[in-house]
């Protein structure tokens, strides 16, 4: 046996590799409590980034640095950190991993959504005991276009099952998987059950055993499996897994088949080199045809180095990543083997996405950006293509959690931060920034297409909870407005509505915890003297029938005709094919439709004094202000409606200020809404897609409570046991050739015989706010609830009076 101690970089090394192929932009995603932050902490220690391992429960991890994160033991906001890792199987040069640790709680799903927009790959962490949970499936859907590797964590826990989890993964995600390593258990004198202490490396046919008592990820013993007795169980399982791997790769990769039969291996799966296997797995992973699966126990420091190797081996560099989505769609985006994405055939065009905005008490405003093409230099003039505004940026930094490292420039594939007073109020989350890669003021050399360019648009989920925000005194009103502006700029999934009639300010968010964190920040971090109402469900209204068309026309040249109607965003393509342009108004799926807009842009050079961008922004502002409290049932915001501007619109060519344009269009929208009475308005409420896991003996009680007390609609009832006979055939077709190693501990784990069933139900959110405690009572603590926002639904007539009374 050999003693192997993982080589680690010194924490003082600050110089990063500059070639693009050496970067890995990856995210850590998982269901809450699967071990994301713990895994990240071990990665940083193994890489020499930190000298001491922090602990989530102790509140001293690197990436969970906010006070509320450390108090609650959960990740609230995404944290970015860069570090080097040397994969011993490749050349001697280190790779740079730009890692983003994301939240797992459903209330902070927007943090995950915006992070996924800038990542080239992801590590999906699975709880080896819980398996593939509801939030895991949701994260898989969000990241379906991103190459991933899976890490089955917590294999040291009683009831953990690697193959059980692997079966769930292949069944629930419909993705082909390949086992790169799997758990190794050893019988000890201290325990009746086998103890997890290492992994079996299928690629290199090695057994890696960690000394778990040493409490260090570095103390690893390496055993050559081929030197063991043929009857040794570890060797037998490894050979079966390698044969399975070769069959899977042979089915998906023709080049591998040729190398397998014509190369040195001569058709023997044990003779295929690690290099050939890794090359094929990498190719298929980047093509999103295969997902490598690894095992470990992060808290016990087991399996971290192979996971880091897997990130380098299998996940793409920016040169290999999928091309960004660009609008307008006629702007060409091609792959350049040297620089990655080349946008609009412009070698010197730097394109960056601002995916996160935050305020630091010391550094001020910080804008996190991902560079897609070109080079962004400190001190350069840039343009925000959303607003059309040009401004000079200050210092550029790379973040190491809450520590900043200043750099002179950011290259393609890098994730960095804009800082300085010059960017204040200039950039919001989701904005695209363009610049010239060489000239400081070269932005002037770009044309109209570049100035309209948008990259990887970020969709903001609609908020479903709200809370009233009131100043403690009238003198504090401006302070509160500024604080709310700051907090919503950082987190656009928070939304502020001000009722112009009552003056009431309402803060909307994704969940109760989401709003609790926002309240904490306003009071404790921003020191705003404010009172809050009770957190409540956010209701909306919509139109049943379109309003009448109303018109404004005068001798000065103003001519606008418009109406308001219910609208489904799925019909946007139909509108655009007819020559109209559709613009999102807000987070409530409201839209502005400008008929004939595309023809206007094509047939003329836009002779108006007011720029195109300002014209659209003005009409959008009118729509937003008019719709936010226009409902007649409960004076609520309108949802899923469209303001349709008829194609004969016009205004004076020499009009320079948009103020009159704003006033006219806003009055018109209000007038249009007055043409229909209250009977044309419908009250809407958020409904949730609930996944409720309950013991079989409690199904009847729980379903009766859901249908009667919660007015839920039951969609289906599923068996959580993937191995049940009715699922075996489907699982077999999805996991063809995949070998499932023996789950050594499941036979001895103290698991109750009462199998769990999953109830899928559509439920009004209002009826589910306190349901978790009720479910625990009905199931003696064994029931589990997970909910996803499904959409807005009409409120039944019998429930409307109670809801209006609550409002």
UniProtKB/Swiss-Prot annotation:
Gene3D superfamilies: 3.30.70.240, Elongation Factor G (Translational Gtpase), domain 3 (3.30.70.870), P-loop containing nucleotide triphosphate hydrolases (3.40.50.300), Translation factors (2.40.30.10)
Localization (cell): Mitochondrion
BP GO terms, sorted: mitochondrial genome maintenance; mitochondrial translation; regulation of mitochondrial membrane potential; ribosome disassembly
Highest taxon, organism lineage: Eukaryota
One Gene Ontology MF term: GTPase activity
SMART domains: EFG_C
GO-annotated cellular components: mitochondrion
Keywords: GTP-binding, Mitochondrion, Nucleotide-binding, Protein biosynthesis
Similarity field: Belongs to the TRAFAC class translation factor GTPase superfamily. Classic translation factor GTPase family. EF-G/EF-2 subfamily.
Function summary: Mitochondrial GTPase that mediates the disassembly of ribosomes from messenger RNA at the termination of mitochondrial protein biosynthesis. Not involved in the GTP-dependent ribosomal translocation step during translation elongation.
Additional observations: This protein may be expected to contain an N-terminal transit peptide but none has been predicted.
Protein name stated in the entry: Ribosome-releasing factor 2, mitochondrial
Taxonomic source organism: Candida glabrata (strain ATCC 2001 / BCRC 20586 / JCM 3761 / NBRC 0622 / NRRL Y-65 / CBS 138)
Gene name as annotated: MEF2
